[in-house]
Amino acid sequence: NRSGITSVDLEKVNFNERSGFKLVDLSGHFVLNPKKIKLEKFVFKTPKTALNCKGIAFNYKDLDDLNDFVNAVYIEGSIQQSKIDFKDLSYFVPSLQSIERTIDFSGNLKGSINNLFVEDLNLSVSPLSYFKGDVDFKGLTDLENCLIYLDIHNCQTSKLDLESINLEKFGLKNNLKLPVELERLGVVKLKGKL
């Protein structure tokens, strides 16, 4: 329109894709203007995944910033309790196809993709393994040199849970092998800053 603002309301968009991917619900209010893309009350659901976003904004100085999305676009958002199943991700990242795991999460995002701060992150991969705290990523797009700062409010896991993650499916040569002595510790709890 003339003001440069486009607004769209989606309500319960769904489809079955030929590959087997099934979208049960795509809903939300979307706004695009010369400085921002904003999603409010965003819902993305499949039979195994549910992403619920109170609001998320992608802010930029001008549309040219979208060409350098990972550095030039500033993200602010709040994600309510959500879950992602790796089977659903595998439609977009085929190497994840054989991973049978669901991740539950919520948190608040601030920053660019490359330098992202996640506040009040609640992340759970099993009833025994979870993380609650803040995470600050510096250089996230260069994983080999990425710095990760953790403010751990509450974290717990066990040797068996960590070893159950099949790292070979993430492209690494070997799965995690921890010393037998750690098994005697049972469930390990952590708090602090790293």
Residue ranges of model-derived segments:
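Extended amphipathic, helix-rich lipid-handling scaffolds
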Residues: 1-128, 143-194
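Short, T/G/N/S-enriched strand-turn elements that build extracellular solenoid repeat scaffolds
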Residues: 55, 135-136
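Conserved two-metal-ion catalytic palm core of "right-hand" nucleic acid polymerases
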Residues: 69, 134-135
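A compact, surface-exposed functional segment
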Residues: 140
